[in-house]
Swiss-Prot record:
Main location class: cytoplasm
The protein's name: Large ribosomal subunit protein uL11
Annotated compartments: Cytoplasm
Lineage: Eukaryota, Metazoa, Chordata, Craniata, Vertebrata
One GO biological process term: translation
Family: Belongs to the universal ribosomal protein uL11 family.
Source organism: Chinchilla lanigera (Long-tailed chinchilla)
Length: 165
């Protein structure tokens, strides 16, 4: 027999899903079925919570306590950059591996770095800013109409000042 269900126990489940869509509930079922939750209801809740992130792959953190699920969106750096580009959502099924040829400001990069600061491995904010610039390079966008790696070189040479915190 399984152990008795403890109503105060908190379980945390991380899921990758596409924003604004109800993922296949068959994928949710093995993860949250044993915790006494309905996969269909949780799928609808996730779709509602990720409405702002339409068409982007994001991580969702489910905190489950007493058969209630709290949903928290944990966006990746690339998802934040693509959202900052303000591109219209594209059809995932038609286009794969899209290069985003937009342009964002250095201030937006700094804001994204501040949001990602707690998850970064860098010691200072300037290191986190360089991480985000590297991600911007991978996404394929420009920063202040320049290639992101040129800005990284400028930060290393002291030409561009990074905020302290």
């Amino acid at each position: 027999m399984p152990p008795k269900f403890d109503p105060n126990e908190i379980k945390v489940v991380y899921l990758r899903c596409t924003g604004g869509e109800v993922g296949a509930t068959s994928a949710l079922a093995p993860k949250i079925g044993p915790l006494g939750l309905s996969p269909k209801k949780v799928g609808d809740d996730i779709a509602k919570a990720t409405g702002d992130w339409k068409g982007l792959r994001i991580t969702v953190k489910l905190t489950i306590q007493n058969r209630q699920a709290q949903i928290e969106v944990v966006p990746s750096a690339s998802a934040l950059i693509i959202k900052a580009l303000k591109e219209p959502p594209r059809d995932r099924k038609k286009q794969k591996n899209i290069k985003h040829s937009g342009n964002i400001t250095f201030d937006e990069i700094v804001n994204i770095a501040r949001q990602m600061r707690h998850r970064s491995l860098a010691r200072e904010l300037s290191g986190t800013i360089k991480e985000i610039l590297g991600t911007a390079q991978s996404v394929g966008c420009n920063v202040d109409n320049r290639h992101p790696h040129d800005i990284i070189d400028d930060i290393n040479n002291g030409v561009v000042e990074c905020p302290a915190s």
